[in-house]
Curated annotation (Swiss-Prot):
This is Na(+)-translocating NADH-quinone reductase subunit A. Its EC number is 7.2.1.1. The lineage of its organism: Bacteria, Pseudomonadati, Pseudomonadota, Gammaproteobacteria, Vibrionales. It comes from Vibrio cholerae serotype O1 (strain ATCC 39541 / Classical Ogawa 395 / O395). The keyword Glycoprotein does not apply. One of its GO terms (molecular function) is oxidoreductase activity, acting on NAD(P)H, quinone or similar compound as acceptor.
Length: 446
């Protein structure tokens, strides 16, 4: 067991009950183009086209051969683009149940499948995009291999679903997915979990590792740091547990599995719980009649590192397993910093709230102050469990010094790994965005 002592479990109200129920009927789904780092699409459909489930929608010009497929059968009703013609979303109106089918196999055949056959089926179905590389957090090239695939079978994000609830419901598919991954990699498959028991693959290169401690103990970046540190020449892939289930279903049934179980939770959700929906679901439809009156912000993903779901982005993200809802923090408080703060949370224990153990808070979107200078008062060190100097690294990200950032470990990180640093920052810096700018610069310069 690897125990993490540094970190932070955010005491936010609205924890979901760990029981799965069916979500609202979804009439629109979308693929969000900006989720895929560096992707430039070659479109295969236009508005008005009828598409089958698992039919190709677009390919990546910069990563030849990588295909992005439809999660449902229906009609393309919107192709939204932003500045410089960046693809924002391809929206599909759900209709019918036509689908593209693939080869299917018996469970005892999966571990002995040819690696090229596995790649072909994953690419053609669109499930290849479930993998993300470190460094850079991109979809891997289809001619690449990895000596380490990390399966995140735990989730320490605030308000997250408990993975064992989902995995135990799909245990056969989960094991089948692990068997496929074991044949895909030239090295090991690391299944990272809490201390709970999970269905196990019998393949010798599939290892289970237990992590314990506060968030970010459940992030792929944390697991890689301790088990297989990455660098420019040392690449690892990660995949979440629900995509492992989808891989298993694809090879067992020959059909693309796009069902998602997400946590619908937060301080303004009427009944926080786990809901069954579809990948790319319209979040406006999913949360309909589920939230309290007033101005709220719907977030695809974690409250720490998710994205605001509005307009052309108002859909469930490809890599997101939760939908968080917070009240917009529009109200200003005169001299709020000077008040006792019984119902306020502070990492630095500035308020009385820290005296009440186990208290949860109705947090909002307010940042409690305006932007200011970066102030190194030890907050970053409290929440960074990785063996690196966070204050120095974050300073270099602010200054745009990519050479120094690489020396300090920037290549190991993804935006989600710095989300807690953003949360505890007195200067209100968005370190995830600064990290992405730095990684883009490093990759461009080679």
């Amino acid at each position: 067991m690897i125990t993490i002592k540094k970190g932070l479990d955010l005491p936010i109200a609205g924890t979901p009950s760990q029981v799965i129920s069916d979500g609202k009927a979804i009439k629109k789904v979308a693929l969000l183009g900006e989720e895929y780092v560096g992707m430039r699409p070659t479109m295969h459909v236009r508005v008005g086209d009828e598409v089958k489930k698992a039919q190709i929608l677009f390919e990546d010009k910069k990563n030849p051969g990588v295909k992005f497929t439809s999660p449902v059968s229906g009609k393309v009703v919107e192709i939204n683009r932003g500045a410089k013609r960046v693809l924002q979303s391809v929206v599909i109106e759900v209709a019918g149940d036509d689908q593209v089918t693939f080869d299917k196999f018996e469970a005892n055949q999966l571990a002995s499948l040819n690696r090229d056959a596995i790649k072909t089926q994953l690419v053609e179905s669109g499930l290849w995009t479930a993998f993300r590389t470190r460094p850079f957090s991109k979809v891997p090239a289809i001619d690449s291999t990895s000596e380490a695939i990390f399966v995140t079978a735990m989730d320490t994000n605030p308000l997250a679903a408990e993975p064992t609830v989902v995995i135990n419901e799909q245990s056969e598919a989960f094991v089948a997915g692990l068997d496929v991954l074991s044949a895909l990699t030239t090295g090991k498959v690391y299944v990272c979990k809490k201390g709970t028991s999970l269905p196990r693959s019998q393949q010798p290169n599939v290892e289970e590792h237990v992590f314990d401690g506060p968030h970010p103990a459940g992030l792929a970046g944390t697991h890689m740091h301790f088990l297989y540190p990455v660098s420019a020449d040392h690449v690892a892939w990660s995949i979440n547990y629900q995509d492992v289930i989808a891989v298993g279903q694809l090879f067992l049934t020959g059909e693309l599995y796009t069902q998602r179980v997400v946590s619908l939770a937060g301080p303004v959700v009427n009944k926080p719980r786990l809901v069954r929906t579809v990948m790319g679901a319209s979040l406006e439809q999913l949360v309909d009649s589920e939230i309290m009156p007033g101005e709220v912000r719907i977030i695809s993903g974690s409250v720490l590192s998710g994205t605001k779901a509005t307009g052309p982005h108002a859909y469930l993200g490809r890599y997101h397993l939760q939908v968080s809802v917070l009240r917009e923090g529009r109200d200003k408080e005169l001299f709020g910093w000077a008040m006792p703060g019984k119902n306020k949370f502070s990492v630095t224990r500035s308020f009385l709230g820290h005296l009440f153990k186990g208290q949860v808070y109705n947090m909002t979107t307010t940042t409690n102050g305006s932007d200011r200078s970066m102030v190194p008062i030890g907050n970053y060190e409290k929440v960074m469990p990785l063996d690196m100097e966070p204050t120095l690294l974050l300073r270099d990200l602010c200054a745009g010094d990519s050479d120094s950032a690489v020396r300090l470990g920037a290549l190991e990180l993804d935006e989600e790994d710095l989300a807690l640093c953003t949360f505890v920052c007195p200067g209100k810096y968005e370190y995830g965005q600064l990290l992405r700018e730095c990684l883009d610069k490093i990759e461009k310069e080679g």
